[in-house]
Amino acid sequence: MILCLYLANPPNDLRVCNRMGAHHGCRRGCPATDPEGIRAMTSTLPPELIAKGKGDAKPVPHKPEGASNKPATGLRKWLDEMDAIGELRVVEGVDAEASIGLVTEMLHHTEESPAVMFDAIPGYEKGWRVLVNALGNRRRLATTLGLPTDISTFDLVDTWQRALDDVVPLPTKLVESGPITENIMKGDDIDLLKFPTPLWHPEDGGPFIGTGCGIITRSRDDGVVNMGTYRAQVYDAKTAAIYISPGKDGRLHRDTWFNAGEDMPAVIVAGLHPLQFMASGLEIPRNVPELEWVGGVLGEAIETITGEFTGLPIPADAEIAIEGFLRHDLTRDEGPFGEWTGYYASTSRPEPVFEVKAVYYRNNPIILGCPPEKPPYEAQRFQQYGRSAALKREIQGAGIPGVTAAWTHSVGGCRLFNIIAIKQLYQGHSRQVGNIAAQVRQANYLGRIVIVVDDDIDITDLHEVIWAVTTRADPERDMKILTGALSGALDPAIHPDHKGTNSRLIIDACRPWEWLDRFPRAIGPSIEVKNFTRDTWNWVMD
């Protein structure tokens, strides 16, 4: 497939087409035949950037010239696997400041779009690359997890739940060196600006190298290591910023250092194997280091080196690792940044400066990018399974019986809108589930709406969920508001001066227990019969 970009419905509807230079009936045609097409695509950018977006993109092999013939590890092994199943596209000549972010937004909001790697980025060394949309469809996600590509939604959720319940973490394996140590910058040689870090959204405060990243920290109090996905902005050659929302493990670690008047050691890893990246954004138990959990999932210990300046573990086959200290006594304006709620959720504000002490990187390094967009976008396409499994597990862990399924819906960024299905067992059961589901760890941070339904509802189908709400829930009787719940700076619905807490709407959309035997019977087949009919008679619709 040859990748080109064209404008189908100005000004914001972008598409991917198969033939470079052909006209596809769009209003402007492909940029290859109509150079002004790319101008319309970048109409929201400052005028001085528009000219930089006209570089011709062309397909290339995913391995740069002169690449090593050694067996691939880490992200590169994953790239080989995706290339083998036709899920990877590589293009050259796309500008990091003007166009990579736009193309990524298009990919995130196009069903079944490929993973795309950008190379020969204007102004940067050829071979220094950016990978986006890595886990943007179920086929790539299933392959990454070693599962059948046609696995069902709830089988995938159950797989994640088993991983959370049954996996025995494997301690990381310390090695002296690895691919990550092929190149090391220290002292005056440090230059973060050598990496082709994109401007992901037109109004971002600068380039953010940390989007599809894992940021490694350690608690000063108990030494527990955490790897979380937090945004990281590049200021200049030797300094950056790391924004961590209150309540997150990395922020709790930061507090232990700052409260002692000390800088926090940290490592920004911008190029992990996608499974490691997934783990960094999943609320696994706090006492389990993410790299050890991934090792348990894979059945093989993750090899790490020890950071020279921080002593923190760094995956030996990562692409880029930026080691340094988050200053407790020095701040600089960070942001704004387009966030997962679909808004520039906060203005620029002072945040601690991250002083870089060393940069480790592989030959021909790859930045893994997963910038937030208006949901649903790439992150939700994989987070919805792991977070749904975690939510169900935590409700059951609170001792609540009868929970048959949970779903952290992608339209709410897998945080704002959660649905739980239950088999009602006793009076008040559905209310109990709603209250607990609004406050467990998975749903606590920046939640908004919790809906509890009976187990005859397919909770992944919004039509069925809203049908249950509109036909089984009476607003006065079944809709309750919980106040004083944990929110954060990224909550767009909360006044800028009161971002710490928000309220939760809990909707009991179950049939009323008090007169369950008199509630009207629903028409239509059960979920099981419906699925059987689709499997048996799907050919009728071909």
Q: What are the residue ranges of the model-derived segments?
A:
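Ala/Thr-enriched low-complexity intrinsically disordered regions
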Residues: 8, 22, 32-33, 40-44, ...
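Charged/polar low-complexity intrinsically disordered segments
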Residues: 2, 11, 36, 52, ...
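Short hydrophobic targeting helices and cationic amphipathic motifs
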Residues: 3-7, 14, 19, 24, ...
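Compositionally biased, intrinsically disordered low-complexity segments enriched
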Residues: 25-26, 38, 64
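Extended, highly charged
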Residues: 42-54, 58-353, 357-542
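Terminal low-complexity, poorly structured segments
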Residues: 1-3, 7-10, 37, 41, ...
